[in-house]
Amino acid sequence: MLESSNIAVPLRWRPMQPADVDQCVDIVAAHPVIGPRYGADIENLGRAWRHLLGSAAVNNAVFERPDRKHATIVGIGFAVFVRDKFIHEIKTPPLPWVGPELARRVVGGDSPVLTDDEVRDANSGAGLSEIVWAGTGVPEFEQTRDFYHLMVSSYVEAHRGFLLNELISAQAESVEQLLGGVEAGGLYWNPTHQDYEKAPPEPAGVFVARPHLVGITRKLALTRRGSWVSTLFDYRPPRFGFTRGEQQLLQTALTSFQGTDQELAGALHLSVPTVKKMWGSIYRRVADCDPELVPDSTLAESGTRERGREKRRSLLAYIREHPEELRLHSRKLLRQNLRQMTGE
């Protein structure tokens, strides 16, 4: 058994793959608090997650401890962008256990999870509302400092650059976890008052034992600037308007950073000439908006290797600091909303 704070535990995270789902469901099912909340609905969880993998509305992670021969999954994070109607429903008494409710609805064909088009439109206008479906680990790891820090850093990385309207955390499994969520910036949902509040509407032990919500809205985040959660609501609109295919190329290049066109083509199941054409389109979009970021972009297309590599490194460094460029969005809707905000 690992002690919580003083042992450095080598951990890493990556996106969940279909082959991971059964192990992740087993972690939830075996959890002494979360598992019983699901009851028979644990049978729906794997089917629901498999159905949603690859959706633009899903942000997920598996946390691994790397060993010499293989890596062991020790925790999971799974969050979804949902429709505002569902947010209203789960805030209305009687409150449900959200994880089982989501599993039932997704498997039953009544999914509240946004489609890719709905993610694009909400991220270009009213903003996105998200629920953390699951965020837990095996008992010997979930209380360690390293596990907590990795969960936070992966969550921040996955959510920077989105236009967020409301975030609701996973329903706490203990008073300690509940208080940790509030210290991070969350507020208690009072179903009677239909509002977020700084103090729980009942003793913390009672609050966490029943279905409950802790979350924060964009408006309320302005009052909690000292928390890391509030930083997720900092938003800048994208400048370049990359297509979805260009975003996927850039995201893949960021992951490998030094990936060649041949490697990128293999990862994306594209031909090398197609990848080269996409880079040319990307450079032209950037040059039209910010010529100094990729000067002499024609050189990159004409085969000047060293200049092309430097240009790519410069662009990827910018994209790494501006993840909004990789999020689904509609340039048309963004322009319309900007005109409305400025009164033009």
Which residues make up each language-model segment?
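Short amphipathic alpha-helix that is part of the acyltransferase structural core
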Residues: 2-44
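A short, polar/charged loop-to-alpha-helix boundary motif
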Residues: 83-100, 253
